[in-house]
């Protein structure tokens, strides 16, 4: 018996050592990959605390010699008599309203495709999927012509109103989630006299909350970082979003205030981080459970 126990012990220890080595290598790779991904953000934040001469003379350093908040003060002062809080309010208004419109309209369309039978449902669903393959840049010129004739240029209307007509990606995401709901819930509600609208608001919406929050996070993030759409339709600085305002700190004809650019770019990430951390649980749940059925 002692010989058997002695022979097994080295094998058991050897396997344990292999597991430890494998775990150490795995965590080393994960930590290294995470550091490579967040390094640009760390460098940007560190540069926002450096003086103008130190930003480019100590590129690889993440620790400023003498930390200063002067870049934040200069950046928050804005330009043209408009402080940076105006641009924050514009971006917050744009992202919030656009997110509400995109999520609400997409949920309605997704419910119709998933639970309501109507003539041409398959055809229109195919058309919707085809729009995912169409680059947004292809529609820029015709959309600009239409919005120009409607006198919507230099207003938030071209940025907001199209969001209330749904988003193909969100529709598909919510549709797969709704398809996973038992049909018995709808049938029981119909027996109790509940209409399709009542079923949607009282039963479906509460059950697809993870999918709604997932779509809302994506919509807010995409809208918050959107640069091209505001660049095309907004001309007055008082209407600028954060992305346009940060671009304005860069002037090819004069000295670029890189410190202010890095400082305001760092501040612009705060709302995105807060929303992601607050709703991370719903985001993971919404992505992992979407498409399990249907």
Regions found by a protein language model. Give the residues of each.
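Short, Lys/Arg-rich, polar N-terminal cytosolic tail immediately upstream
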Residues: 1-18
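A structural signal for multi-pass alpha-helical bundles of membrane permease subunits
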Residues: 4-7, 22-294
């Amino acid at each position: 018996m002692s010989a058997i126990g002695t022979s097994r012990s080295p094998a058991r220890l050897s396997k344990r050592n292999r597991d430890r080595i494998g775990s150490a290598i795995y965590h080393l790779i994960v930590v290294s990959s995470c550091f490579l991904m967040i390094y640009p953000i760390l460098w940007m934040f560190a540069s926002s605390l450096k003086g103008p001469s130190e930003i480019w003379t100590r590129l690889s350093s993440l620790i400023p010699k003498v930390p200063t908040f002067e870049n934040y003060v200069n950046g928050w002062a804005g330009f043209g008599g408009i402080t940076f809080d105006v641009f924050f309010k514009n971006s917050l208004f744009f992202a919030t309203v656009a997110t509400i419109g995109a999520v609400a309209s997409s949920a309605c369309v997704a419910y119709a495709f998933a639970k309501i039978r109507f003539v041409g449902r398959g055809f229109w669903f195919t058309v919707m999927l085809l729009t995912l393959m169409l680059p947004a840049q292809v529609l820029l010129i015709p959309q600009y012509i239409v919005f120009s004739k409607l006198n919507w240029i230099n207003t938030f209307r071209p940025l907001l109103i199209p969001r209330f007509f749904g988003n193909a990606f969100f529709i598909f995401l919510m549709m797969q989630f709704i398809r996973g709901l038992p049909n018995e819930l709808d049938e029981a509600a119909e027996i109790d006299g509940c209409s399709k609208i009542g079923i949607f608001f009282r039963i479906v919406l509460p059950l697809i909350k993870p999918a709604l929050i997932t779509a809302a996070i994506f919509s807010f993030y995409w809208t918050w970082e959107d640069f091209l759409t505001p660049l095309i339709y907004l001309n007055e600085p008082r209407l600028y979003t954060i992305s346009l305002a940060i671009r304005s700190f860069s002037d090819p004809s004069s000295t670029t205030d890189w410190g202010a650019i890095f400082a305001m770019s760092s501040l612009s990430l705060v709302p995105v981080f807060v929303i992601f951390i607050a709703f991370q649980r719903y985001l993971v749940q919404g992505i992992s459970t979407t498409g399990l059925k249907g």
